[in-house]
A protein has these predicted regions:
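Surface-exposed, hydrophilic segments of mature proteins
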Residues: 1-151
Length: 151
């Protein structure tokens, strides 16, 4: 699970997920109105401003993929969540900078990056609930992100 926090205002920055990733329903802010000719446009694609995303792997299922190298001591990796971030054509400088003029940074946080705890415990068993709880804490009450339980 990865959480993307985007402080830019008015949907000024947005991205499209790479293959094998899926938005966690109820925990993302969708970028509406991306049309032909807009930066990054791809027919039929969904665009996001921020939120919680899960690696589902090539199966394209609804649950987190279990990565395995089949070899203890080796690492297994997902692909990247997104390759580019686009700026909305209607964005203003004030949408992209704070009150001091500093350009906003998007933050990407890995919430669950391994299936076991190193002692044989299964971290993936409650991963969905745990990741949503952590995303809620990171969101800090961002409108349009999360569930009715205060995300």
């Amino acid at each position: 699970y990865l959480y993307v926090k985007n402080p830019a205002e008015n949907g000024a920055l947005y991205f499209k997920l790479n293959d094998n990733w899926k938005a966690v329903d109820g925990f993302v802010t969708v970028k509406e109105g991306v049309e032909t000719g807009d930066p990054g446009y791809e027919d039929g694609a969904d665009y996001y401003i921020e939120g919680l995303f899960v690696y589902v792997g090539p199966s394209g299922g609804d649950t987190a993929a279990r990565l395995s190298t089949g070899n203890t001591g080796k690492d297994a990796w997902t692909g990247t969540l997104f390759d580019e971030v686009w700026v909305d054509e209607g964005a203003k400088k004030t949408d992209l900078t704070d009150e001091t003029g500093k350009v906003y940074d998007m933050e990407v946080t890995a919430l669950l990056h391994q299936a076991s705890d190193g002692e044989g415990g299964n971290l993936a068993a409650d991963a969905d609930t745990w990741a949503k709880d952590q995303a809620g804490k990171l969101a800090g009450g961002v409108d349009g992100v999360g569930s009715d339980e205060g995300l």
